[in-house]
Amino acid sequence: MYISNIICTFAQNFKHTDFGIIRNMNKVRITAIRQTIYHDLIAQYENPIEHACDVRQGQQWTSINGKCPEGLCPSAWDSMQPFVESLAQGKGNFFDGWMKNPMSAMISCNDGFRPFSFYIEVIENLASSHE
């Protein structure tokens, strides 16, 4: 089992709490927006592989309670997990107004040869910021 699968499994079983009190968390939608493939970098640096990525443009997942959604690429989850968890907890406005929708983020997976960009947004606002 890959370490990222273990991390994703752990995240699915972890309950977010504030001082031991479980609170409502936002539902967060994750949408695969676009993939860029760097054929020149693949040719120069990567050993041939048969299968690289199962994600398809337009695919969507819903994170409930900040957990890794079933079927989401574990490597992509590693990249977006802090943003999904923050949005689920009612925190947003990353980097002082980076996104037009302050309760969203655009994150790419960490595959340097064929990164996928994901739009992450709150779809059900149950939490409020506790700052």
What are these regions (language model features)?
Residues 43-68:
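Short, flexible N-terminal segments of the mature chain
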Residues 27-35:
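A short beta-strand micro-motif
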Residues 36-37, 65-71:
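Short, charged beta-turn/beta-strand-edge "cap" motif at the junction between a beta-strand
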Residues 17-18:
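N-terminal, intrinsically disordered charge-dense segments
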Residues 84-131:
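Short, compact, well-ordered microdomains
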Residues 69-91:
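Short, compositionally biased
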